[in-house]
Amino acid sequence: MDGVEIIAKSIKNSAIEKVFGIVGVPITPIAYELQAQGVGFFGFRNEQSCSYAASIVGYLTGLPGLCMTVSGPGVVHALAGVLNAQSNGWPMILLSSSIDQSLVGKGGFQECKQFESAELYCKKCYYLTEIDHFPEILKDAIETSLSNRPGPVYIQIPADLIKSKCKESPNIREAAGYGTIAIKSVVPDMKLIKDAVQLLSEAKRPLVIGGKGAAYCRSENELLEFIEATKIPFLPSPMGKGLLRDDHPLVVGAARSYALKNADVVLVLGARLNWMFNFGKAPTFSTDVKFIIVDVDENQASKTKNPNVVPEIAIVGDARLSIAEMRKLFIGETDEQPQPPQDSLIKSMKMEESWWSNLNQDIQVKTKSLATLMSEPQNNDQEYLTYHKVFNALRVGGLFQEDTIFVNEGANTMDIGRLCIPQTLPRSRLDAGTLATMGVGVGYSVAAQICFPDRSVVCIQGDSAFGFSAMEMEVAVRYKLPIVFIVLNNNGVYEGLESMSDPKYTSSTESASLHIPPTSLSVDTKYELIMQSFGGTGYSISTISNLLDICKQIKSKQISLPTLLNIKIKPTGTKPKIVH
């Protein structure tokens, strides 16, 4: 067997069904052999977007996505997705070629310190020295990527090994199953679980925050049972939305600011008290708030290592297992007594009635305020659309189904979209995440549609965010992915210009560089033509009536997908009225 066949067979035997990558010397034969082995290969136009796609696969499926690149620049480009996977805690495998072993340090083709670069962001890096070791390295890489706090790993294969030969060995034939590797969940300390339940039961204004870590470990069923048993208010992080339906009566997303500021005990479940939560500090939180942190990351669930807060109780453990045990303690359920007793801890909870009444009052005010913004009419066809008007039309037009995967990226586009589009299922709202990475949207959408071919995928981006990966429209068309891409086009980053007719913008390159605002992009760019040029469908939209008509055609399958809707919105003065 040659190296190409060994690599492809090992990947196939380990049950990896799809690989994302960009071919080149010397990995092109591997891509062909993967296809011959029945493994789907999805070729992208840039390793950055390709690696973003591989990074989100781990979150969506619970199993690492595999990104394959050439050496040197290919690896460097793909490190964007590796860093994204590391910061979000998602499993991922980056597999790349490198210079022949005999040529290291001699200035060979695309030689660079790629291994050292990958070490900065990966849980573990592997440098292959014998091709017949690849199957066992792949097995270890998968296990490492999935275990404890998930994250990316890197496998580097010198070009001479890819071209080498060896006899087929048992470890090649018997590569451990990708989908069958048993990864043990991190079991929480039951004493700490009991302490957490006691503290929550004594709280007057308790709150549960659920993050994408809780979503990753599939804790939604256990979390729902816990929240409904205790009646403790639940607040999702941006990508924790859908753990409980946004319209569940115990979800307080609309009263986010009030809930955070007034809670006295907060159970943080698979979320980090980072910049999204003002690092757990005032004025976002009360100065005397007590935190219970549950996380598989020992640095987060620690009284000494957490960089932002000293939690009252720190539990290193799987969110699903932890919340299930907490519910049992609250209701008094045991293996010997599966039916809850009459004197369960639920009845002795000290949660104030005013806590819920005040939250509900704030929810009503904020919900009404948001509804007012969204329901503002477009008075005439010449009036600019706004973010809220567009999101309202998309909802009214029925573009979002119960199981739609909503990819949302941009600045204003993402912030307002989080509020305007309700979520009903976990892991179904994908955004810029912990790292606030711009450029992830198209790669995420492609990966989501590949992973879930029977679900609709809607990607809504600002025009700036779309620009990072616009060429990947060709990938969506090539693989016949029925994604709806929507670009909210305000001619800029945050805001743009309504016109560039002023001579100071057009008279010369020097004048343009001195006068065009740094936030401005070209005016009225026809992004829909990008999709059309590849054979997809695209539309320029500037009115609500036109948008509703297009939504109707998409729903009735009168429009072939993928499609891109280039929606023109007000370029200036659109500082969003974020409602929390």
UniProtKB/Swiss-Prot annotation:
UniProt cross-references to Gene3D superfamilies, sorted A to Z: 3.40.50.970, TPP-binding domain
Organism of derivation: Dictyostelium discoideum (Social amoeba)
Keywords from the named record: Fatty acid metabolism, Lipid metabolism, Lyase, Magnesium, Metal-binding, Peroxisome, Thiamine pyrophosphate
Gene Ontology MF terms: 2-hydroxyacyl-CoA lyase activity; carbon-carbon lyase activity; magnesium ion binding; thiamine pyrophosphate binding
Subunit structure: Homotetramer.
Pfam families reported for this sequence: TPP_enzyme_C, TPP_enzyme_M, TPP_enzyme_N
Protein name stated in the entry: 2-hydroxyacyl-CoA lyase 1
CDD domains documented for this protein: TPP_BZL_OCoD_HPCL, TPP_PYR_POX_like
Protein location: Peroxisome
Cofactor binding note from Swiss-Prot or TrEMBL: Binds 1 Mg(2+) ion per subunit. Binds 1 thiamine pyrophosphate per subunit.
Domain of life where this protein originates: Eukaryota
An example Gene Ontology CC term for this record: peroxisome
